[in-house]
Structure formats: C-alpha cells, structure tokens
C-alpha cells in the first residue's frame, strides 16, 4: 500500500509525512457507509478512512478544507462518493465544501460550495437515480440544503432545526419527501409548490405524552409511516407527524436495553432490524410493525422479536449496514470494533449467524498518551473509559482495559516508580466517578495493580512526583488526595472490613479553600519533600503542601490544617506592546516579521493580521483601513489595561503545568481562553510578579499540549485546541525560539471542532511523531529532523518488559459501582459499623442477663405454686415492679391518643386531597361525561364533557364585542359624514370648474335675469341708443346660452341611478375569487386582523360551548324521562305480578312462581334504576354496603399477602382461609339487577296482603286444609266454570294491556334515545370540526399577530394620507366658495361701472357737440393719489405711485393716455357739465380700482386653488402608493395564511373530481367549494342571461332614440346654417362685408384699445427682461460681496495674527537687545504709522461694504430713482 504523503508546508519541505491514522470515530452517528462489498468508509479527524472488511487494511482520503471531514454519503450507483468537510474559521476561509469523488478512482468530480457556514454533519443522495443531494450543516446555521449536484447548484434550503442533526434521508417511496432527525427531534419534510414557488416545508414530530428523546436512526415504511429509535430502547411509529404507537417487548420491556442507534429495513425478508447498546441485533416482523395499532387503554403495543443475534455481549452497537444481497451485515460498536455477521442460508438467524470481528481500533476522545521508551508501543487512554496498549506503527491493539466510567485524567508513571512492576509501562487514570486506577502492562494484557475511590466527583487532574513515589489526585469536589506508590500492596486503612488499594497507599487529603476554582492540571515541586502545584480554571496556581508523615489518619484521612496552608499565585502576563504600523505597501510583510508567520496549512492567517479585503478591493486600501482599525482597538485596549506594556491578568483556565528542566523553581505554563495569555507558552517564576513569554502559540486556539524532545530539549512540540500541531526549533534547551524564527513544521492534523490535542510525543528513536486528540484520532507521521534536532540514540534498547503473573501484585478489588463509598466515606462507615457491632454485642449481653433473671423468676413462681397453700405467697406479692402495669396502661392510653390524632390528621389529609382533586378535575367542568343506556339493547349515548367558560374568556368576549360595535358605529358615522362631504365637494368642484351642476346653473340663471332686466329697463326708459340695445340683447342671448349649457352635464357627471345599478351589480355579481390566487387582493371589509380573528375564535368557542350545553340539557331531560319511565314501569310490573298471582289462583293447579316468571319474562332485562355511570356525580359520593364489603375483602387480601410474606412463604395453604368472601345471599343486589324480580317480590307481597295465594297455603290450619281438599273433590258448576273462564280472559286482557303499555313506554324511550344518539353523532362531528377550526384559527392568529405591527404602520400611513386629502379638499371647497363670492361681487362692480357709463350717456347725449371731447376727458387716464390704508390727513398719507392696475381695465374704457398737459374745459362747453363729467370720471376710476383689487384677489384665490389641486394630486399619488403597499402586504399576509393547512371532512359523494371515472391519487389540485354557492352561481348564470337580454333590448331602444336625436340635430344645424347664410347675404348686400358686431360695439365705445394692449404687453416684456437682468446683477453682486467679506475676514484674521506675532517678536527683541541701539521715538512712530495704515485699510473696507449695501438697497427698492 503506497504511503499517502500530506503536503504540510511549502516553507520547510518534507519534515513530516503522514503514514497512518489510527482509530474510528464510532461515537459519531451515521458515520459508517458501505462503498462496495468489501470496503467501508468512515470519517475521523481530517481523513476519510477506507477500511477493507476482508483484510482490515486501511486507506486514507485526506480532507481539502483543513478543518476536518464532517460527513460522507454513497451514491446509489456506488460509483460516486460525497464528502462534506469542515472549514477552518478565519477571514480567508471560503466556507466548507462538499466534494463529489469518483469511486474507486477517488478523483474530484464536482465541488459544491455555500451550503453551510462552518461544517457539514449529514449527507444523503435521493432515490435510485441520485440526482439530488441533501446536506445538513452544523452549528451555527443547521441549514438543510438540496443540491442539483451535477450542475453544482442549490435547489432549495431551509433551517433544519436549532440543535444537532444526526441524519437525513430521502423517501424511497414518495418523491419530494425526506426526513431529518437529531437531538430531541425528528422532522418530516416535503417539497411543496406554493404561490411563491417551490419551498421546503418541515413538520416537527410531536412526542406528546411520550418522553422526549434523541432520534439517532429512523427508517421509512412503504406507506409513508416512519419508524424511529429512542434513547430508552423503545421504537416509535410515526404517522403524519404524530406518534401512532410505541413498540415494546412483552412485559412492557423496551425493545433494547439501552439506546437504539441503528435501524434497517430488510423488505425482501419482511423484517425490520434494530441494533442497540445491549450488543444485540433484533429482527421484527415487518407486517406487525407496519400494521401496529395501540391498545385502547394505552399508546403502546407489545411485540415479540422474530429473532436476535448477539454480536458482542455488553457492546454498545452504533452502526448496522447490510450488503446488496442482504446476506451479510456490517456492525460497529462504540469501542471501535467492526464486525461482520454472515447470515445462514436457512433456519433461525440467531443460531446460524456467524459473527466475526474484522478490526479493532481505538475509539472515542483520547484523554492521554504515553509512548514507550523502548519500543513502538503506546498507552492510549480514551475518554469512553478504555485504556489500550497500541502498537502505533502497525495499528494493532495489544491489550485493553475497559471500565463503564469515562476517563477524565491520565498521567504516566516513570519507570523508576515502585509501582511499576518490573519496570513495565504503568499509568494512572482518573475517572468520572472519582476512582483512581493503576494499570501496568504485562504479558497477559493490562493488569490492575491499584484502585481507590478518592473523590465524590470526577477526577480533574493527576500528578506523579519525579521519583515516582507519590501520586496526587485532584477532584472536581474541591479535594486533593495524596497517595504513596509502593512496590507491594498495602492494607490501607487498618480498619477491619476495608479492602486494600493495591499499590496505592492512601496518605491524606485536604479540601481547597472556597473560591479556589476547579483544578485543571498539576505538577510536583522539584524540592525534596515539596508539595504539589495545581493550576485552576481561574488562572491561579495553588501551592498545596505535602501532608506530614506522622499525620494520624486512624479516624479520618482529612488533614484540616492543610487547607489554611494552601497559597495561591495569580498568573499575570505582560501586555504586548503594539507599535503603530506604517501605512505602506510592505505593512503585511512587516507584520509578518513582527508576529511570525504561519504556513498554508493554517489557512493563510499570518500573525501580522492579513485579511482579505473583499472582492475587487485593493490590498493597500484594505491594509490601510485595517491598520487604522487596529490602531483604534489597540489604543482602546491600552487605555483599558493601563497602557501598552502594562500587566494583564488572565481569568482563563490553566491547561498544563510543567517543571522547567533547565531552571529550578520555574514552571512552563499554558493557559486557555481567548486573551493574550492563551496565545503563548509562558515561563513562570513563583517569586516574580509577571510571567515571561516562552513560545509563540496559535492565533486560533490556545496551546493545549506542550512537550520537549531532541537533544537537551531543543525541539518543542505544541498542540492547539483546534487540532493544529507544530514542531518548533529552540534557540536554547527548553528555552524560546530565535527571534523571527519560523516553525520547523506545522499542520492542521485534527478536527477543528473536536480535535483538541491531548497528547504529543516522539518515538524513542525519533523516527515517528505520534499525536492524539479529542476527536479520537492518533496520527503517525514519519519525521526527517535535522541532525542537530534528532534525539540521541536510545540508552535502553530491547523489548518492553512484560512481567508475568508471578511478578505482579495481587489484583485489588475493583470499584465499579457508581454509588460506592469514597475512601473517607468508607473509613467513616467502617467506624460506624464497628460502633454498631459493639453496641449490638452490649445489647446481646444485656439480653442474656435478662434471660437468666427471667428463668430465675419463673423458677421462683413454680416453687411458689408447689408450696402448700398456707405457705404460698399471693401473686401480687411476687410482682417485680408494681408500678410497671400502671406505666403500661398509661403508655397504652398515650398510644391510643396518638393513634386517634394520627387518624384525625389522616382523615383531614384525605379530605383536603379529595377537595383538591375535585377542585382540579371537577370544579372547572360544567358537565362531565355521563352515559345513558337504552332500555332495550346495548345502545348508549353520552354527554359532551363541557368545561366552564372562564370569567376571563367571557369578559374578553364582551369587551371585544363592545369594541366591535363601537367601531362599526364609528365607521357608519364616518362613512355618512364622508359621503355627504364628498358629494358636496363634487358638486362644488363641478360647478366651479365646468360650469355645470346646480351652482353653475344658478349663476347662469342669475346673469340671464340681470341681462333681461337691464334690457327691459333700457328699452322702457328710452335712454339707450340702438347700439347699446343691441349690445344688451347680445348679452341676454349669451346669458341664455350659458344658462342652457349650465343644464348640460359634463363628461365626469355620473347619474345616481347608474351608480346605484353598478353598486347592485357589484354586490350581486357572485364573483368568487380564489384566495390562493397570487393576484387576489382581500377586500377591505374582509381583511383579517388579530382582533377580528380572536373575536371569531371566542364566538366559535362560545358557540361550541352553547351547542354542547344545549345537547347536555336534552340529555339530562331524557335521563329524567328514563327515571320516570322506570318508576312507571316498576308500578306496572307490580300490577302485572298481581295479575300473575290472580291468574294462578284462577287456573287452580298452576304454579304461581312459574306464572309470574312467564308474565314478567319479556321485561326481565330491565334495570331496577339508573346505573352508577348514568349518575356519576350522585354515585361518586354514595358508598354502598357492597363497596364496603369489597374494600374489606381487598384489605383482608392485602393483609393476608403481607402475613404470607412475613411468614416465609407459606404459599397457597396459608391464604385459603383469608380469601375474599362472597357476599351473603341477603346482601345488596347489584345495581344492574333486573327490575322484574323486584317487581315480582313486591307483587307477591301486595297480593299476600289482599287475599290468599298459592304460596300462602303453607300457612293454613289442618281444618282449612281438609276443607280445601273436600272442596277440590267437589266438581265445579257451570256458573263457577264460566266465572273462572271470565276471570282468565279478564286477566289475559289486563296482562296484554299492561304489557302493551310497558312496551310502548320502552319503545318511546328507545326511539327518543336513538334520536338523541343520532343528534349526538351529528353534533359531535360539528364540534370536532369546530375544534379543528379553532386549531387552525390559533395558527392564523399567531400569523396575524406577527403581521399586526406592519399592518398598523401601513394603516397609520394611509390614515395620515386620508386626513391630508380631506384637509386639502376642505380648503379647495373653501377657495371655491370664496371665488364664487368674489365673482358675484365683481359682476356687481362691473354693473356699477356700466351704470356710470350709462350716466355719462345721459349727461352727454349723442347730439351734444362736445360729446367727443367730454368722452375723451371721461376716458382719460390720469395720475391719482390713493389714500393709504389707515392714514390720516397730510401729504404723507398719500401715495403718488402710478396706478398699476390700468392693464386690467377694458379696452373699450380707455381712449387716450395722459399726455402730461394741463386739463381744461373745452371752449364753449358748459362748466357744470364738464365738472359733472370729471366727477363721473372719478367714479369710474374708483370702480375700476375696486375691480382691479377684486381681480387681483380672484387671481390669488385661483392660484391658491391650483396649488391646492396640485398638492391634492401629490397626496393622492402618495395615497395610491400606500394603498399599493397595503395590497402587497395583504397579498403576503394572505399567502402566509394560505399556507396554514385546513382539514375539511368530505364524504365520498361530495367529491366530483374524477379522472376517467376514478378518484385520482393526488387531490392537491382540487378545489373545495360550497354546494349552495355553486347552485347560486348556476342560478346566477340564468339571471345574467335574462339581464343580458333586457340590456340588449334597452340598448336597441337607446340606439333608435340616438338616431332620431341625430336627425333632429342635423335639421337644427341645417336651419342654423340657413340663417347664418341669410345673415351673411344681408351683411354683404348692406355693408359689403361681414360685420363683427362685438368689435363694432367695442370700437364705438372705446377706440385704441388694441393698440394700448399691445403697447402694454411690450412694456411688460421689456420691464420683465430688465428686472431679470437686474436680478442677475444683484445675485452677482451678492456673490462678490460674500467673496469680499470672506477675503476681508481672512485679512482681518491675518492682520490680527501678524499683529500678535509682531508683538511677540518685538517683546523678544526688546528683551534680547536690552536697550542697545534702540530709538524709542522711532519705534513708537513706526508703530503709529503701521496702526494708522491698518485703520485706513479697515475704514476703506468698511466704506466698500457700505457702498455694496447701498447698491443692494437700491436694487431692492421699487421707486424710479434706480432708472435715473
């Protein structure tokens, strides 16, 4: 077999090569698979071991990710192998991968990445094709991932569980299903198609009343049920996520004595195989397991195994596999043994099976390792309690010693120790139960040479002195026990009865002071007679003195004075100085040089702290950012710890303590934890306050193992807590490494999670390195060390000494019981036993003396009786103690009182217990389960067991109903107000925007009335000319058109009738949308909330309660009827018995009893009353004589059994007389006795009271009997015969009548009983359905509560948007109202201005020669002074600004501009007329000013309305977005609710989903729909057809009307065209052109309007451009001003700084030159000049600032000075 060389380091070359890995990790579940018929595979540490079942040879497949191998799975074709690995933590790690290897070539085919974060724990291929691979991750994510491994793609993933998962398997029978199991759970998965796609849905198995258990193995049965294992040895059969039945062996014994670790289904053979911790493989019948049903009174079923195979007695089996043919099994146990079981071709399997142990390997975590100094042999202590002698080159197990307890401590003994027989390899081991054992390797294996139980708890540490003469053991209970190691067995305690401890001689123990912590390691001091040094989990070193040799341990081993003599030393390490790194491109290299490098085996993590900066990031940038972060962290750490280089104490555990061979009094210490102390190995001198660093440790885990080898200890061997092993060359013996020296060799050999290195060592010849760790693996590596580091040749060549039996001491008795006494307890118990024996001996001597005295007294009594009567003494005189009898009587009375009190106490206790049980089981019930039997037949009906609705439930229901009513009322009120407001708003909006609607119609009608009135007034007065009359007529026509158009609805107008019809159609359309539709949006009124769902659940619970209560009321009424019926039947049966007696008397010789039995025979089975189960509440409190008799019988039986047991087993002969007695004949009849018998008895009694009967002849006298015989001999007459016949017919008639009445009563009751039972069946189905609805509702309520917070946020957002919208709508309505008011007022002002014009026409008629001049004066624009608001008198109260509102004046009202000349009355014109025109002009101008103001106000309101409308659109957009978010949220919520499974009970006739006339296998595509709704939909189809036909007819009629209206419209348009043509012809004939009448009116009334308007527009544009230019200039000047201000400020600051600097310089200069060559006058003058210059500069800048401010003010003013 070629060696598999592991490339461990590229820097050091081939220093170490892996040769083999010993051990099997059989403690890991599902860690053994079959690759072919001869090869099994198992994971251990970082290797996949391939084991040959025929030869036992091993091959290795190394892991690739460096963290170990986690799981393995075999493809169904057995040509592929999947290996899931573990990744080492760190920034450079990409996570673990699953590698697909070809087999047997072992070449990588595929690589699957991204399935988990740290490690894989289980793998499995699916089905027969193996297209899908399932993987389960380890802590912390526990991800279940399904892979399409051929495409290297993830299909699905979900979290498997929150704890360890042991196994995963696909269903071999149902595609898309798989099962996982692990710690405390089993989970059933299926790939389900949801509305969001394919998902993994897992149902956790519910254990219910069964004890929770880890599920190590499971197997799926063909019908989908799953059989799983338990820790207690039972088998669980699962069906649909629930336990169907628990399988046990007969006698309620578990299927295995211990946990079941493996299950296998052998379908061809029809059996299920199970392997457990009892070393047996049991076979179970597949049919019995598959069809198992629980018993009625239990959830379990007892099954007997078909057969069993004993693999190994006492072996804990952990794996069970079968080859492809099923004729051979492969079994592994937790001790590392692998077996093959060959099955016989026929016959019983248990007898014919051949079990062969194929291989034996170390298994379990390694607690310690000892290499031989002579041979390639090692002692390996496994944590599972097995100590093995191993040939680590060949891997053969030479010997082993197993114990049931775990090994917790290990230390080898030096060969010079007296306890090493013949110098053999000897080791001391400590166990979890506190036992310390010594094992020596001998010719027969591993011999036990010493044993002692020193502690109550586990042994935490062991240490042997350098000379091998003393051993110390530290326990977790805080005790430290000292032993002397001897060459011969010692008696030990000297106390009789105590066993010897072999070569362990107990010396003494001490208790550590409280608060010392738990001991983790120890070493003896080098000084002669020195004590022991113990490391603790609190980072302290305890110095424990050696007990004195003359210590008295006769009564106790405890040395009390030693506790106070214990001293403590706290490990304090110096905090490292962290120099700040230079930000350069070689930072990483410098860090590497400072901190040391690690090779590729460590994942590229250098001590310098290099990290990947992410994809696409530059190395320099990442290093710079990291350097800054590290500097901040270092500064914070330095501040917390008192500065860099200061002391830093460790609170982590101390892992190892070793004496420094090159320095007496110094210790080599390694510490745990995550701090700085855990990253190094330290040299500690107990007299110094700080520890000195010795060796660099590991960055990822503390140093857990430290050893030295080579010449003078110049080679250090280090192991870490995560499986790293390092060889480090030392600069000096047992010293530190050279500065900057790299490790000689380093590699991650062991598992990163469980591979804590526990042992390292070089072979005696230096050729091999052996490592051991907690992952159970032992690595053997070949070394090629440099000559200077190679160990010297061995000084003890030869074979290992193996002493024979004669050279070994006697084997001491082993301590195997976990509850055995410790040495101290055994000593104390031995002394107590000795004291008890001495007390018993004293008691025996006293009893013997009493016996002699009693015999002497009896002899005196006999002598007294033999004496003559005269000499005989009375018996009272011979009474030894006269007061003894009185004392005994007083004692009897006292005991009687005590018994009475005890009985009273017991009675009260029973009463309180009964009250507690009644309160717990009955007080919460409104009605318990009561059975009611029918009177005929065996039919029964029961009540509903109804619990009372709690007060909390009722209060919550009432509160929620009240809240629902209040919410409904508030919603109705808000809806009414909102609807009214909405309608008003719409009306206002339409009236204002389109002119339609009531508002616009009213305004148009008002204008029409005004125009009509003006026209009529003008016509009647005759003051208006023809042009004005025509103008008014046209205005009237315009008003008429406006009024007509106002009645026309706009495009947005909706008819109320149409809206009502649409609403009715929406309400009755019958559109049933599936809630499973991805696009389904739940309507507002149907959306579920937690409050609604909780209210529905409470109402359903109340309804179920009311249904059950109503039925129970009917039930109890029927029970009362039964009681009455039985009473009536009892009376009628008594009458029937009397008739039977009369019939017997009538027939003469008939037997009365036979006649009565014949009469009552049809009713013999009737009960005499209600049965106890029909009145449980009444029967519960009643105690009958039969109950007392039965209790007495049981008590007597118990006493008899107790007496029989006390008598020594008299068997059945002693108990025959004490058996239970039968009730007497006159005892109480059973409750279910026949009512007819009682009726017969009562009938006979009644008859006896009324007259003679056949039975009454026994009481006749002799004369009466003679008379009766004589009468009987006389033949009857015809009358008597007739009378007798009449009596017989009468009796038969009454009998038949009574029988019919009784039968009718019974039938009526039975019919009512049957009806009630049928009703109960229906109600029970409804109640169960309601309860299932409650369960579904509970799941929905949980989901709704999860969604409630998000929904509340969305609702709050939507309500805020609605409030904003309502506020804006209200503001728009307010603006609309204001606009309408202003418009009406403006129309009034326009009318007033028209009245002024009309008044002008009246003052200056058309015939006036000065009209044109006066009209020009009237329309002239002049500058007017407007009075300021709130102004008083004076010139300052007037504003001389030009009227800015001229542009708003009509063009027909302006004739000429003010030319600036003086205005005078036209020559020849009347001055009064001229002044009147001027007054009218002032009126016009006043009206125009008011019109301008109103126009400006209307424009402002219009702009405000437009801004509000824009804001309303934005709010509506936001509201639409919130509604969209709400709809998406509701979809998501409905989707989650759709995933809740709802159970619907259907009958077969309700299923109409058939394929080819058959019910399909898969009903997942079915839709459950209400039959009533389906019928309503069908009826709705007919209704819609009828509505469609009606709508077609209406549409046809409307089209006909539309055509008629179009024809009318065409006629009207033709008429209008004809009139327009006539008007055109008339105008052309009369004027030669078409006259614009409106233009003519405007021209006639105001000339030059258009020219003025054009000029005005030009001026406005010019002014606007000029204002824009000035605004730009102002902004530029403002920017310049800001820049200058900043520059000025900077200059001032500079001047201030220069001035201060100058003053400082001058002060210094003055101080230095000390007055030499200094002219104070010149200096003062220079200072004044410089200060003046600065002041001038500041003044100039201030003037510039003032100038700029003036410009700004000038630019901001609106007067005309800026244009000058």
Swiss-Prot record:
Intervals holding WD repeats: 115-157, 160-199, 208-248, 255-294, 361-400, 454-493, 495-534, 649-692, 707-752, 753-791
Family matches, as InterPro entries: Beta-prop_EML_1st (IPR055439), WD40/YVTN_repeat-like_dom_sf (IPR015943), WD40_repeat_dom_sf (IPR036322), WD40_rpt (IPR001680)
Subcellular location: Cell projection, Cilium, Flagellum; Cytoplasm, Cytoskeleton, Flagellum axoneme
Region (Disordered): 570-654, 972-1003, 1426-1468
Coarse class of the protein's main subcellular location: other
GO biological process terms, semicolon-separated: cilium-dependent cell motility
SUPFAM superfamilies the UniProt entry points to: WD40 repeat-like
One GO cellular component, as annotated: axoneme
Biased composition (Basic and acidic residues): 585-596, 604-628
Compositionally biased residues, Basic residues: 575-584
Keyword list, A-Z: Cell projection, Cilium, Coiled coil, Cytoplasm, Cytoskeleton, Flagellum, Repeat, WD repeat
Parts forming coiled coils: 821-850, 1479-1517, 1567-1674, 1729-1758
Pfam families in the cross-refs: Beta-prop_EML, WD40
Composition skew (Acidic residues), residue ranges: 629-641, 1434-1462
Family annotation (Gene3D superfamilies): YVTN repeat-like/Quinoprotein amine dehydrogenase (2.130.10.10)
Family: Belongs to the CFAP44 family.
Role description: Flagellar protein involved in sperm flagellum axoneme organization and function.
PANTHER family hit by this protein: CILIA- AND FLAGELLA-ASSOCIATED PROTEIN 43-RELATED, CILIA- AND FLAGELLA-ASSOCIATED PROTEIN 44
Protein name (database record): Cilia- and flagella-associated protein 44
Native source species: Chlamydomonas reinhardtii
Encoding gene (name): CFAP44
């Amino acid at each position: 077999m070629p060696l598999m060389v592991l490339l461990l380091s590229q820097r050091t070359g081939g220093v170490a090569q892996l040769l083999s890995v010993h051990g099997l990790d059989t403690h890991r579940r599902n860690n053994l698979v079959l690759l072919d018929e001869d090869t099994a595979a198992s994971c251990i540490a970082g290797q996949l071991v391939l084991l040959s079942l025929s030869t036992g040879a091993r091959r290795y497949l190394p892991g690739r990710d460096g963290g170990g191998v986690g799981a393995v799975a075999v493809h169904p074709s057995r040509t592929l192998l999947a290996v899931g690995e573990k990744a080492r933590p760190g920034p450079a790690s990409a996570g673990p991968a699953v590698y697909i290897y070809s087999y047997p070539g072992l070449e990588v085919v595929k690589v699957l990445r991204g399935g988990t974060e740290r490690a894989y724990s289980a793998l499995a291929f699916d089905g027969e094709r193996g297209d899908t691979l399932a993987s389960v991750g380890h802590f912390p994510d526990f991800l279940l991932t399904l892979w399409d491994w051929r495409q290297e793609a993830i299909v699905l993933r979900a979290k498997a569980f929150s704890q360890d998962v042991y196994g995963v398997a696909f269903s071999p029978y149902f595609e898309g299903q798989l099962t996982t199991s692990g710690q405390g759970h089993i989970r059933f998965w299926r790939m389900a198609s949801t509305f969001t796609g394919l998902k993994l849905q897992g149902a956790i198995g519910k254990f219910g009343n069964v004890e929770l258990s880890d599920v190590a193995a499971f197997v799926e049965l063909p019908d989908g049920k799953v059989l799983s294992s338990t820790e207690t040895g039972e088998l669980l059969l699962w069906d649909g996520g629930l336990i169907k039945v628990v399988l046990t062996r007969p006698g309620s014994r578990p299927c295995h004595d211990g946990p079941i670790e493996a299950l296998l289904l052998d379908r061809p053979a029809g059996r299920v195989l199970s392997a457990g911790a009892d070393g047996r493989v049991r076979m179970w019948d597949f049919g019995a397991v598959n069809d198992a049903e629980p018993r009625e009174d239990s959830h379990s079923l007892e099954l007997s195994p078909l057969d069993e195979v004993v693999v190994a007695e006492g072996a804990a089996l952990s794996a069970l596999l079968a080859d492809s043919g099923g004729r051979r099994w492969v079994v592994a146990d937790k001790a590392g043994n692998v077996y093959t079981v060959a099955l016989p071709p026929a016959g019983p399997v248990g007898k014919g099976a051949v079990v062969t142990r194929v291989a034996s390997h170390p298994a379990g975590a390694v607690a310690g390792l000892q290499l031989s100094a002579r041979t390639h042999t090692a002692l390996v202590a496994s944590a599972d309690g097995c100590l093995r002698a191993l040939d680590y080159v060949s891997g053969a197990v030479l010997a082993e010693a197993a114990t049931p307890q775990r090994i917790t401590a290990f230390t080898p003994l030096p060969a010079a120790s007296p306890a090493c027989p013949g110098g053999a390899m000897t080791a001391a081991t400590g166990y979890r139960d506190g036992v310390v054992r010594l094992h020596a390797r001998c010719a027969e294996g591993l011999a036990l040479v010493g044993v002692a139980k020193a502690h109550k708890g586990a042994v935490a540490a062991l240490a042997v002195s350098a000379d091998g003469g003393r051993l110390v053991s530290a326990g977790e209970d805080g005790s430290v026990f000292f032993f002397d190691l001897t060459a011969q067995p010692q008696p030990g305690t000297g106390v009789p009865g105590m066993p010897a401890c072999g070569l362990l001689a107990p010396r003494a123990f001490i208790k550590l002071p409280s608060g010392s912590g738990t001991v983790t390691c120890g070493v003896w001091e080098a000084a002669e007679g020195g004590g022991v040094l113990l490391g603790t989990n609190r980072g302290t070193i305890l110095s424990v003195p050696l007990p004195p040799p003359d210590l008295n341990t006769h009564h106790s081993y405890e040395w009390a004075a030693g506790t106070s003599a214990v001293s403590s030393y706290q490990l304090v390490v110096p905090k490292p100085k962290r120099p700040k790194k230079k930000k350069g491109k070689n930072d990483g290299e410098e860090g590497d040089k400072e901190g040391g490098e690690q090779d590729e085996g460590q994942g590229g993590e250098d001590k310098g702290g290099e990290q990947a900066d992410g994809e696409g990031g530059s190395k320099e940038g990442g290093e710079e950012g990291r350097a800054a972060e590290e500097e901040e962290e270092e500064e914070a750490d330095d501040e917390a710890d008192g500065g860099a280089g200061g002391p830093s104490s460790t609170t982590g555990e101390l892992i190892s303590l070793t004496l420094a061979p090159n320095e007496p009094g110094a210790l080599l210490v390694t510490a745990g934890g995550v701090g700085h102390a855990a990253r190094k190995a330290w040299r500690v001198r107990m007299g110094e306050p700080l520890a000195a660093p010795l060796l660099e440790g590991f960055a990822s885990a503390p140093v857990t193992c430290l050893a030295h080898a080579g010449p003078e200890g110049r080679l250090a061997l280090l192991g870490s807590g995560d499986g790293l092993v390092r060889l480090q060359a030392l600069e000096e013996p047992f010293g530190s490494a050279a500065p900057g020296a790299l490790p000689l060799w380093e590699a991650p050999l062991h598992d990163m999670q469980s591979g804590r290195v526990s042992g390292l060592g070089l072979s005696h010849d230096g050729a091999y390195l052996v490592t051991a760790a907690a992952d159970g693996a032992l690595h053997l590596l070949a070394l090629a060390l440099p000559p200077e580091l190679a160990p010297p040749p061995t000084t003890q060549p030869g074979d290992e000494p193996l002493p024979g039996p004669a050279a070994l001491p006697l084997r001491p008795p082993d301590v195997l019981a976990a509850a055995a006494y410790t040495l101290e307890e055994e000593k104390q118990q031995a002394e107590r036993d000795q004291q008890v024996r001495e007390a018993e001996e004293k008691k025996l001597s006293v009893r013997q003396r009493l016996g002699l005295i009693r015999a002497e007294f009896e002899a005196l009594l006999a002598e007294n009786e033999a004496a003559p009567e005269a000499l005989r003494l009375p018996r009272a005189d011979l009474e030894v103690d006269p007061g003894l009898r009185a004392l005994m009587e007083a004692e009897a009375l006292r005991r009687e009182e005590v018994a009475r009190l005890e009985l009273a106490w017991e009675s009260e206790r029973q009463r309180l217990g009964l009250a507690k049980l009644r309160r717990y089981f009955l007080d919460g019930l409104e009605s318990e389960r009561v059975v009611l039997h029918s009177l005929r037949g065996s039919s029964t009906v029961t009540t509903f067991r109804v619990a009372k609705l709690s007060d909390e439930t009722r209060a919550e229901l009432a509160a929620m109903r009240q809240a629902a009513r209040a919410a409904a009322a508030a919603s109705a009120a808000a809806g009414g107000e909102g609807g009214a407001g909405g309608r008003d708003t719409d009306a206002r909006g339409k009236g204002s925007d389109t002119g339609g609607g009531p508002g616009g119609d009213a305004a148009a009608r008002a204008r029409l009335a005004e125009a009509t009135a003006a026209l009529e007034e003008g016509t009647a007065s005759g003051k208006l000319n023809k042009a004005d009359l025509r103008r008014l007529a046209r205005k009237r026509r315009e008003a008429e058109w406006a009024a007509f158009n106002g009645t026309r609805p706009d495009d947005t107008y909706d008819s109320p009738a149409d809206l009502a019809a649409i609403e009715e159609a929406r309400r009755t359309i019958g559109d049933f949308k599936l809630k499973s539709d991805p696009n389904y949006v739940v309507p507002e009124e149907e959306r579920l909330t937690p409050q609604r769902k909780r209210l529905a659940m409470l109402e359903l619970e109340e309804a179920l309660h009311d249904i059950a209560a109503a039925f129970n009321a009917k039930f109890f009424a029927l029970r009362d009827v039964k009681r009455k019926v039985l009473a009536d039947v009892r009376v009628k049966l008594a009458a029937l018995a009397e008739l039977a007696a009369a019939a017997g008397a009538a027939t003469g010789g008939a037997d009365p009893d036979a006649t009565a039995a014949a009469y009552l025979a049809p009713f013999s089975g009737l009960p005499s009353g209600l049965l106890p189960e029909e009145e449980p509440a009444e029967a519960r409190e009643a105690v009958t004589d039969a109950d007392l008799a039965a209790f007495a019988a049981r008590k007597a039986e118990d006493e008899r059994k107790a007496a029989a047991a006390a008598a020594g087993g008299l068997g059945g002969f002693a108990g025959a007389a004490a058996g239970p007695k039968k009730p007497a004949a006159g005892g109480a009849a059973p409750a279910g006795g026949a009512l007819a018998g009682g009726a017969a008895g009562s009938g006979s009694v009644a008859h006896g009271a009324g007259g003679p009967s056949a039975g009454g002849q026994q009481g006749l006298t002799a004369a009466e009997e003679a008379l009766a015989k004589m009468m009987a001999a006389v033949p009857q007459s015809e009358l008597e015969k007739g009378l007798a016949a009449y009596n017989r017919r009468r009796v038969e008639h009454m009998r038949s009548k009574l029988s019919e009445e009784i039968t009718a009563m019974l039938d009526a009751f039975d019919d009512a009983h049957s009806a009630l039972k049928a009703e109960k069946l229906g109600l029970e189905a409804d109640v169960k359905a309601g309860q299932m609805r409650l369960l579904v509702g509970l799941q929905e309520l949980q989901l709704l509560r999860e969604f409630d917070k998000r929904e509340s946020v969305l609702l709050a957002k939507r309500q805020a948007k609605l409030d904003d919208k309502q506020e804006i709508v209200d503001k728009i309505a307010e603006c609309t109202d204001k606009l309408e008011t202003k418009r009406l007022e403006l129309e009034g002002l326009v009318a007033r201005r028209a009245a002024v014009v009309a008044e002008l026409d009246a003052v200056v008629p058309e015939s006036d020669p000065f009209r044109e001049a006066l009209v020009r004066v009237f329309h002239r624009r002049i500058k007017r002074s407007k009075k300021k608001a709130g102004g008083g008198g004076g010139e300052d109260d007037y504003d001389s600004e030009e009227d800015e509102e001229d542009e708003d004046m009509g063009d027909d009202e302006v004739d000429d501009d003010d030319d600036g000349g003086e205005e005078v009355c036209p020559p020849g014109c009347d001055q009064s007329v001229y002044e009147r025109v001027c007054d009218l002009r002032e009126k016009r101008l006043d009206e125009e000013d008011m019109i301008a103001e109103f126009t400006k106000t209307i424009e402002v309101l219009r702009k405000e309305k437009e801004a509000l409308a824009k804001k309303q659109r934005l709010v509506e957009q936001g509201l639409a977005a919130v509604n969209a978010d709400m709809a998406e949220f509701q979809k998501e919520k409905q989707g989650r609710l759709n995933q809740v499974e709802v159970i619907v009970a259907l009958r077969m006739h309700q299923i109409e989903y058939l394929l080819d006339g058959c019910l399909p296998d898969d009903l997942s595509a079915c839709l459950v729909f209400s039959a009533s709704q389906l019928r309503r939909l069908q009826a709705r189809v007919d209704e819609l057809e009828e509505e469609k036909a009606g709508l077609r007819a209406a549409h046809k009629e409307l089209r006909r009307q539309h055509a008629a209206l179009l024809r009318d419209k065409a006629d009207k348009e033709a008429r209008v065209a004809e009139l327009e043509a006539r008007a055109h012809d008339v105008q052309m004939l009369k004027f030669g052109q078409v006259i614009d009448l409106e233009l003519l009116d405007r021209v006639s009334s105001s000339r030059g309007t258009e020219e003025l308007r054009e000029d005005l527009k030009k001026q406005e544009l010019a002014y606007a451009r000029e204002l824009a230019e000035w605004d730009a200039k102002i902004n530029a000047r403002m920017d310049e001003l800001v820049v200058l201000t900043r520059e000025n400020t900077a200059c001032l600051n500079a001047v201030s700084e220069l001035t201060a600097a100058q003053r400082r310089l001058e002060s210094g200069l003055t101080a230095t030159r000390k007055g030499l060559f200094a002219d104070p006058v010149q200096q003062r003058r220079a200072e004044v000049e410089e200060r003046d210059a600065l002041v001038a500069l500041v003044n100039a800048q201030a003037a510039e600032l003032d100038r700029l401010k003036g410009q700004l003010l000038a630019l901001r003013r609106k007067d005309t000075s800026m244009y000058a």
